[in-house]
């Protein structure tokens, strides 16, 4: 299943080679990686960019654990930038994996990764795109950390138009009922039963969003979040 996200793809295209770090943010599992590694990379290749000039690195993959160290990441990227006459497109996914726990926990501790990315931006022939989705990747934080060199593209879950385009054989009313019930996270479309959709969303909320909230606001007692959630959901 291939979902078109033309609205966001066009935003990346418009920002191409603008001298800033394109930062793709958004809630977990809303399609940031797919947009960057599939749709945008495909666009680049279709418009004449050679494979060797696209440096893609998913930092959530344990095979790339070494490059979660910002210094190693910098060395890795720079090792590919050899042809001064060509533009290199650096696509880094889930950059929060290159931010240490201490940097995440303490807002007063500078994030080394941001210095590395700012340093890479000094190379005259690179165009940088990154994705991230945790509490250190809020738009206001990014603009502060990148010192005016960040250009944020905020991704949202699927609109109903995007959602319905993937609902082959389903009438629009039924599709909207599903959309209104389960929302527009792309992976929901791959779940075949109501039970599977509910379980996916429940697991995502418990394992991901709770953790981000606790991390962002340094909440040690998870019962506080449970109680707040109950109040909001019953309102």
Residue ranges of predicted features:
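Interdomain hinge/linker elements that couple catalytic modules in large macromolecular machines
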Residues: 2, 154-235
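Hydrophobic anchor at the beta1->P-loop junction of P-loop NTPases
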Residues: 24
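Conserved lysine of the Walker
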Residues: 32-33
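Pre-Walker A adenine-sensing motif
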Residues: 2-19
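Short glycine-rich substrate-engagement loop in P-loop NTPases that contacts/grips substrate
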Residues: 55-86
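Short regulatory helix/loop adjacent to the ATP-binding pocket of P-loop NTPases
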Residues: 135-151, 167-168
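P-loop (Walker A) phosphate-binding loop of NTP-binding proteins
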Residues: 27
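Conserved Walker B catalytic segment
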Residues: 91, 95-129
């Amino acid at each position: 299943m291939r979902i078109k996200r033309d609205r966001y793809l066009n935003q990346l295209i418009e920002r191409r080679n603008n001298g800033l770090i394109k930062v793709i943010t958004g809630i977990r599992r809303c399609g940031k990686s797919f947009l960057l590694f599939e749709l945008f990379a495909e666009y680049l290749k279709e418009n004449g960019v050679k494979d060797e000039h696209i440096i893609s690195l998913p930092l959530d993959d344990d095979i790339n654990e070494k490059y979660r160290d910002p210094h190693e990441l910098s060395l890795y990227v720079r090792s590919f930038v050899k042809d001064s006459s060509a533009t290199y497109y650096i696509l880094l996914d889930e950059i929060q994996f290159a931010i240490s726990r201490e940097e995440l926990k303490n807002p007063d501790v500078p994030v080394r990764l941001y210095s590395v990315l700012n340093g890479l931006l000094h190379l005259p022939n690179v165009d940088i795109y990154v994705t991230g989705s945790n509490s250190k990747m809020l738009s206001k934080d990014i603009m502060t950390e990148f010192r005016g060199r960040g250009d944020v593209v905020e991704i949202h879950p699927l609109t109903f138009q995007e959602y319905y385009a993937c609902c082959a054989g389903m009438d629009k009313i039924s599709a909207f009922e599903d959309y209104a019930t389960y929302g527009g996270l792309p992976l929901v479309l791959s779940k075949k039963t109501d039970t599977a959709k509910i379980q996916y969303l429940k697991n995502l909320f418990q394992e991901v969003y709770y953790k981000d909230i606790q991390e962002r606001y340094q909440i040690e007692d998870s019962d506080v979040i449970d109680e707040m959630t109950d109040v909001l959901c019953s309102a």
